[in-house]
């Protein structure tokens, strides 16, 4: 089992080995976040942050709230904070972001990590690549633009006593690693790929930033987390090799080849793999036209019964809803008797509430989908529609539903996203058809958005989907909601997809210091429920913290809440014990003061276990009215 103590565990630098690498006068303290202090000419400069307030200058490399709060401690009331120019305005007034976020979180497809600052942090000196920053005693820091782990990332370069030292934040960790993979999700404009489909979208920027840093030939790199990097060239080369292997693997079984085609995916691949790289893509599996009894209406499928009734899978917006109205007006169907929702993205669910009301029919879903449909504000997931469905009939995994000349079997099917279902459709005159939402296409698997929670575990995620597809009756077809075809994989093709997926697990495991790669791909392994709630002044409520222990061992996790003014709780600290590969929760009561200031407030939680200490990791929104 891999130890993650090098990244997160509270551990002070022990004696000479770490300090001996640094020039005299640079103090390095290792902890959950590393702290660097330089004192010269009666001035104290701190890099990243620290527990002693009153530093004259505090340099930060990017904007995540664990780092900005660490910097705030060091700056105290008088210290000058130096930060990337692109985020200076945000740091001046973060409440504007959170107020807008109350609405923006719905129908959201930019897919950026949400662990952003809550309280303002005045930036005395915004800096950008190419700038030179004066430090105490005549020291000079050069600034490099090094985006990758974050959009705004920068690196500070210092030459002292014949050594060139780089302070690069979370750009690279010792051993050629990074803290996680989901932080690299982003748009790839060069390939006309948006943020939602941008798996590893900033890995190309990471490679270029690492090459820029390598060209500077630093003697040491001091990251925000973990050990000093004493072999910069070796660790940089190792990290580039690792991310290229992961991205090549991802592209080789990519469902997007069906939609975006070779030109766009090759363009995306070469940004990471190199300008002349050969990009391997999977060719299309067998596919044929839909049967006459299944009509393709955008992302909606309409099933026709022998007596003229219709049954709908998904209804994602005005277009599909208008098509259903046309089908009724034209007599293609005489009535619609039910809607099954495969998953929670708005292009499959936004018009469900209107359709159900207009057609007077029930809505069906598996439990993991149903709660998001009924309580969308309680969740933060990609593309969640704010249009709440009043009543969803929950179908258990494996539950059968007889409708007209059809037999339906509902399945929990956590492929494209964790909150995902599927419907096996059988009728006497046709081979079984498995409507799998958006989880596969004829060219592979739909795992292009890490925020969808594509868990890489034997008991769930795509491995569960592979098992269910293999168990289908021989000759069964698959249907993707976006595709007007039946398709199916040969056993050999499914074996290849699964083999590549297993290989990627090992590659991700080597990329990050976590003891299980799922922490590196699952941003919401610890998340509040409800994510957002509205409470009036003087009201009470509750907040549940849901935690997944992805580790193969038991964990005790200590939790501490950080509450905004006007919000209190009877207990702000608690301990959760979880068995290996289990998830659990704890509930915190909330009380809103009678004189609480109205507006959107943010609650956060620290998470501490024996080998990690994560500050303000999870957040929830409370709108006080």
Language model features by range: what are they?
Residues 44, 132, 140-233, 238, ...:
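Metallo-beta-lactamase
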Residues 506-536:
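Low-complexity, acidic Ser/Thr/Pro/Gly-rich terminal tails and inter-domain linkers that flank the onset
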Residues 547-551, 592:
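Asparagine-centered strand-capping/turn motif at beta-strand->loop junctions
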């Amino acid at each position: 089992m891999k130890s993650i103590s090098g990244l997160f565990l509270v551990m002070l630098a022990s004696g000479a080995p770490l300090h001996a690498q640094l020039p005299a006068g640079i103090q390095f303290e290792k902890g959950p976040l590393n702290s660097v202090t330089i004192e010269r000419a009666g001035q104290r400069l701190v890099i990243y942050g620290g527990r002693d307030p009153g530093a004259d200058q505090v340099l930060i490399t990017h904007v995540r709230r664990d780092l900005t709060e660490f910097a705030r401690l060091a700056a105290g009331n008088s210290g000058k904070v130096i930060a990337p120019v692109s985020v200076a305005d945000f740091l001046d007034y973060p409440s504007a972001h959170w107020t807008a976020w109350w609405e923006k979180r719905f129908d959201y497809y930019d897919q950026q990590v949400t662990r952003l600052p809550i309280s303002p942090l005045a930036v005395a000196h915004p800096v950008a690549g190419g700038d030179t920053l004066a430090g105490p005693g005549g020291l000079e820091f050069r600034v490099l633009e090094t985006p990758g782990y974050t959009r705004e990332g920068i690196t500070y370069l210092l030459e002292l006593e014949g050594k060139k030292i780089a302070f690069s934040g979370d750009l690279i960790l010792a051993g050629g690693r990074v803290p996680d993979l989901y932080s690299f999700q982003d748009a790839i404009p060069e390939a006309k790929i948006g943020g939602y489909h941008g798996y590893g979208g900033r890995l190309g920027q990471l490679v270029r930033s690492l090459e820029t840093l390598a060209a500077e030939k630093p003697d040491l790199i001091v990251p925000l987390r973990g050990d000093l990097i004493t072999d910069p060239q070796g660790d940089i080369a190792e990290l580039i090799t690792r991310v290229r292997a992961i991205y090549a693997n991802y592209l080789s079984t990519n469902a997007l080849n069906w939609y975006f085609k070779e030109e766009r995916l090759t363009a995306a691949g070469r940004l990471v793999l190199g300008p002349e790289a050969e990009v391997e893509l999977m060719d299309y599996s067998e596919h044929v036209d839909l049967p006459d009894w299944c009509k393709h209406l955008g992302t909606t499928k309409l099933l026709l019964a022998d007596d003229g009734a219709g049954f709908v899978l998904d209804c994602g917006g005005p277009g599909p809803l208008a098509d259903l109205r046309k089908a009724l007006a034209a007599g293609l169907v005489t009535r619609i008797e039910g809607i099954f929702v495969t998953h929670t993205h708005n292009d499959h669910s936004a018009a469900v509430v209107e359709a159900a009301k207009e057609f007077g029919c029930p809505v069906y879903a598996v439990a993991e989908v149903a709660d998001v449909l009924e309580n969308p504000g309680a969740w933060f997931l990609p593309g969640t529609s704010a249009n709440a469905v009043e009543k969803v009939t929950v179908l258990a995994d494996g539950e059968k539903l007889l409708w007209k000349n059809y037999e339906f079997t509902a399945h929990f099917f956590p492929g494209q996203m964790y909150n995902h279902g599927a419907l096996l459709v059988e009728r006497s005159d046709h081979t079984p058809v498995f409507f799998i939402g958006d989880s596969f296409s004829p060219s592979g698997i739909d795992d292009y958005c890490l925020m969808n929670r594509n868990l890489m575990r034997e008991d769930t995620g795509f491995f569960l989907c592979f098992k269910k597809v293999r168990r289908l009756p021989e000759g069964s077809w698959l249907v993707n909601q976006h595709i007007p075809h039946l398709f199916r994989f040969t056993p050999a093709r499914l074996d290849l997809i699964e083999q590549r997926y297993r290989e990627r697990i090992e590659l991700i495991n080597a990329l990050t210091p976590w003891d299980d790669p799922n922490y590196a791909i699952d941003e919401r392994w610890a998340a509040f429920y409800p994510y957002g709630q509205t409470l009036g002044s003087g009201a009470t409520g509750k907040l549940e913290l849901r935690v997944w222990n992805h580790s193969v061992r038991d964990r005790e996790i200590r939790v501490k809440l950080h509450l905004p003014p006007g919000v209190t709780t009877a207990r702000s600290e608690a301990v959760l014990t979880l068995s290996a590969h289990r998830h659990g929760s704890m509930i915190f009561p909330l009380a809103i003061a009678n004189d609480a200031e109205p507006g959107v407030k943010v609650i956060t939680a620290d998470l501490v276990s024996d080998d990690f200490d994560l500050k303000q990791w999870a957040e929830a929104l409370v709108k006080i009215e």
